[in-house]
Each structure stands twice: as structure tokens, then as C-alpha cells.
Amino acid sequence: MQLPRNVIAGPGAIRSVGDLCRSMRLKGRGLIVTGKTTKQIAGDIVADSLREAGYGADFLLVENATMENVEKAEALARELKAEFLLGVGGGKSIDIAKIASTRLNMYYLSIPTAASHDGIASSRASIRHDGETVSMQAEAPLCVLADTSIIVRSPYKLLAAGCGDVISNYTAVLDWKLASRLRNIYFSEYAAALSQMTAEIVVNSAHMIRPGLEESAQEVVKALVSSSVAMSIAGSSAPASGSEHKFSHVLDRIAPKPALHGEQCGVGTILMMYLHGGDWEKIRDALNTIGAPVTAREMGIEDKYILQAMTEAHKIRPERYTILGDTGITLEAAEKVARATGVIE
């Protein structure tokens, strides 16, 4: 079981990174993996805090989460004799730091500038390799440091997408239970309960999640970390990734302009909850209250891609059994579900 040793979320939290590293007994140089914009937003503050605490601090600027950039991070860390890595920014920077540090057998810190998905604290990363985005096993971060005064200034749609990613735990757990019954897959009651409870908290708090409120950012960060912990307990992503994530992964491949991961997972949850015979209206209403998209039009994706994703989703990670079964659903069934839920008109 891999869990972060420390999670700090609050206004101004990023300025304590140097002290946090000392309390974790880290030594030497830190390599900060970040993007051009996030360096200005948070990376420079992280570097200053590290230097004030007596650490060396260097940067690697990246744009995409690719194996090429992972290898660049590894090479630079070796060249600089860095002792630990810090992923500062969105999912791409954190995922690169996550995989590079795992391959180097180093600690890394996760310092998100947005709360858009549960990768900020998980032990899995999405990396582009050989033209495909693959999910890779990694180590969980040593610490997660989420500065809500920075996160709350990020585009609100990122926070809303984070809610969609958490809410998708509902159908992920249902799929996991189904796989356990039909395929004798390992099922952890504790991990499933934590994952479902996390989704329920976000749904029940939907009316309190608003733009510009640090309290909203803090609640979503805690939910994302909790979701990551559920995955760590399970030893897999099953508590937080089921048929709705498969649907999202297909959209990433086929849609000319995919929506955010959490947005697609949120809409996928509406569709898959309908297939499960559950309360899909509750999911839709919560997402709508939060301000996340609930239709293909709101995601900016044509109806035909929604239907194609629904019929092809079962092909993603076929070893993970879901409500879609081994053969998937027909185009006619997909259209019926999508129209019944209002995802397409």
C-alpha cells in the first residue's frame, strides 16, 4: 500500500515546501518539473522556498507527458545529482515527475496548481508512448502540497472537472463489484467504501462548490486525495476507474477536440449509471449544479463520437470487466441510453 506521508492543503501552503522537505529529511538538490506558465505561477515560489531552506533547486520545463520528457527528467536529475523531484503544475508535470522518480528510485513531491483529476496523489500516471496514452504504475508522492490560493485562481472548469473525476467513483465501484461477482476479481470493501463515500460527499456538497471560493478548492483537493488513497488501498485504479473512464479514453482517441478528462468521466458516469439502473439523474443534477458539462454539446463533442465511444469503450483494458461486458453494447443501445439521459439530443 503506497500512501503520501503528508498532505497539506490551504492558502499559502506552497511557501512551506522548503520546511516540509526538511521535516521529511530530504537532502541535496531538488529538480522541479513544471511548465512555462506554471513556473511563473508556482514554480519560482517553490524554488525560492527550497533555496531559503538550504536546498539546491533546478528546473525542467515540459509541455507534454511523454516518455521522451520522462527520459529528459531522468537524465537531468542524474546530471545535476538531484536527490528528489517535484512535480509543479497540472497532471502532465506531476506525471512526468512521478514516473521519472519511480524509475530513479527517488522521492517526489506533488504540487498541483489545479484540482482537475485524482492523479495529484495517486500511484498511477498517464504517459504518451508510441502514439498511445498508457496508464503506468508508479510510486505515490512523498507529500502533496496544494496551495488553495493558487488553485482557486485557476480556470473554474478545471475544478469542476475534478469534481467529475471524483463523482465517477460511483460507477467505478459498481463495475468493480460486478467484476468481483462475475469474474472473482479481488474486491476491497474498505477501498470501495472510501471511494464511494468520497463521491457522495462531492455530490451532497455540489451546491457549495463555486468559483472563487478557497473552501471549494480545499474540499475538492481533499476528495481527490481521498480517491487516490482508495486506489492505493486497493492496489489498483479499480475503485476510481471503470466503464466511465473507458468511455473517456476512447473520446481522447477519436474526438477532434476532447474535453477535459474529468468532464468526459462525469458525462460517462451519467451514461454508465443508466446502464447500471442507478440514479443517473442525481449524478447529472450534481454535475449541473457544480457547473460541469452534462451533454455532448456542452463538452463541444459531436454526438457521433459519444456513440462511437460508448460502443468501443469495452475494448479499453479488456481485462477490467465492467457493465459493458466483453462484447460492448450496440449502436442502437448506445443511442437509446444517450438520448434517455439527455447527453445527446
From Swiss-Prot:
Cofactor, free-text remark: Binds 1 zinc ion per subunit.
GO biological process: glycerophospholipid metabolic process; phospholipid biosynthetic process
Bilayer-crossing regions: none
Cofactor(s) recorded in Swiss-Prot or TrEMBL: Zn(2+)
Binding residues for NAD(+): G91, K92, S93, I94, D95, T113, A114, A115, S116, S122
CDD domains listed in its UniProt record: Gro1PDH
GO cellular component: cytoplasm
Positions with a binding annotation for substrate: D118, D165, H249
Catalytic reaction list: sn-glycerol 1-phosphate + NAD(+) = dihydroxyacetone phosphate + NADH + H(+); sn-glycerol 1-phosphate + NADP(+) = dihydroxyacetone phosphate + NADPH + H(+)
Domain of life: Archaea
Alphabetical list of Gene3D superfamilies matching this protein: 3.40.50.1970, Dehydroquinate synthase-like - alpha domain
Protein role: Catalyzes the NAD(P)H-dependent reduction of dihydroxyacetonephosphate (DHAP or glycerone phosphate) to glycerol 1-phosphate (G1P). The G1P thus generated is used as the glycerophosphate backbone of phospholipids in the cellular membranes of Archaea.
Assigned protein family: Belongs to the glycerol-1-phosphate dehydrogenase family.
Binding site for Zn(2+): D165, H245, H261
Pathway per the UniProt entry: Membrane lipid metabolism; glycerophospholipid metabolism
Compartments in which it is found: Cytoplasm
GO molecular function: glycerol-1-phosphate dehydrogenase (NAD+) activity; glycerol-1-phosphate dehydrogenase (NADP+) activity; metal ion binding
Keyword tags: Cytoplasm, Lipid biosynthesis, Lipid metabolism, Metal-binding, NAD, NADP, Oxidoreductase, Phospholipid biosynthesis, Phospholipid metabolism, Zinc
Name of the molecule in the record: Glycerol-1-phosphate dehydrogenase [NAD(P)+]
KW Zinc (keyword) present: yes
